[in-house]
Amino acid sequence: MVSVSVISQERKKVADSARRVVIKVGSSVLTSSRGVDLGVINRLCDEISMLREQGRQVVIVSSGAIASGIRKVGLSEMPKTIPQKQAAAAVGQGSLIQAYEEAFSHYDLKVAQILLTSDDLINRRRYLNARHTLQTLLDWGIIPVVNENDTVVVDEIKFGDNDNLSALIAQLTEADLLVALTDMDGLYDSDPRKHQNASVIPVVHRIDQQVEGFAGDQPGRLGTGGMVSKLLAAKKVTAAGVPMIIGNGRNRYVLKQIFDGEEVGTLFLPAGRRLSSKKQWIAHTLKPQGDIILDGGAAEALKSRGKSLLSTGIIGLRGEFEVGSPVRCLNNEEEVIGIGLVNYSADEIDKIKGVRSNRIEDILGYKHSDEVIHRDNFVLREAIASDDEHT
C-alpha cells in the first residue's frame, strides 16, 4: 500500500509542474434546476484567476450548453431527438459563454469561445489550425472555453462526450495536467450510492481491470458522461504521459486544494513517456481504416526495436485505404501492435507485400518511400487507450 507521504509528494510534484492546465467542467457541476448556476461559475472563475496569478495557462472544456438551453426554453426534461438537442444547444451556448465572460471580467480576464467537432481534429490541417489558434490565445493571455459544436454535430463526427473532448484538448495543447470536475469526490472503490463505506481512491498508478471495475457508468440527469467515460479519458491522457485528477467541482476551493497538492479527488499518474503531439494525434484522434498483418520479424522490429515497417515484413492486409491513412498493425496471431500512417495505399501494399524495399520501384513503377510506415508515424498499442475503436 502506498504511504500518505508518498501520495502527498506525488500530488505536490504534479501540481507544481502544471504550467498549462485543461479544466473540464461537467453539466452536473455547472447547472441547477434554474439553468446555468452563476454562483458555481463565479466561484470557479475566481479560483481560475488565482491559477493565472500563479503564472499558469488555463483552457476550460465546458459542458452545460444543452442543459442551459433546456432551462431557458422551459423544457422539463432532456430532449429526445437530435434536432431538439441541437436547438437547445444553440439557445444555451450564448448564455453559457456570457456567464464566463461576465465572471472573468471582474479579474480583467478575457475568454474566447472554441466550438469543435471531431472532424476538426481528425483532419491534420484543421487539427494544426486548432492547435495554433489555441496556442495564440494562450500567448495573448486569453482563456479558451471549448465545447463540442452540438448545434451542427452528427453521430459520425461526435466526440462522444466532453470527457473525451477534454482528453483530446489536453493532448492538442500539450497540457501538463487535465482536471475533470464532476459532482463526485473522485473514483470510489465501490458505488457510493449503494455502499456507505465506499471511499475515494487517492491515486491510481495504472488503470487495470480492477480499476476499471470500480467505475460505474452512472451519468447524471443532464450529462452524457459517467465515471466510465472519465476513466477512458484518463487512459488516453496518462498513456500519452499526462496526469489527470478527478475532483468534485461542487466543493468550494477544489482547484486551490488540488494545486496546493492536497489530497482531494483521484490522481491518475502517467503510464508512460510523454508522446509527441503528432503521435498523440495518431493514437487518440484517428480511426483506423484497415489492418496490416506482419510476420514475426517485422512485429518484433516494431514492438521492441522501434524500427519502421518495411514491405518485406508484410504478409497480409484488410480494408481499403489511401496514402496517409491510419491503419492497425497486427502480428500473425491477430494481436494489435500499434497504429501508424501508411506511405502507400492498400492496393499498392497488396502488390509489394513480402518484397524488399529495393524492388518497390520495379513493381509499382515508382517509390514513395523505403518504409510502408515510418517509425515517427507509428504508435505502439501500449500508448493507446484500449477502447473499441482501436482494438
Predicted regions and their residues:
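C-terminal catalytic "cap/lid" subdomain
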Residues: 2-77, 82-110, 114-391
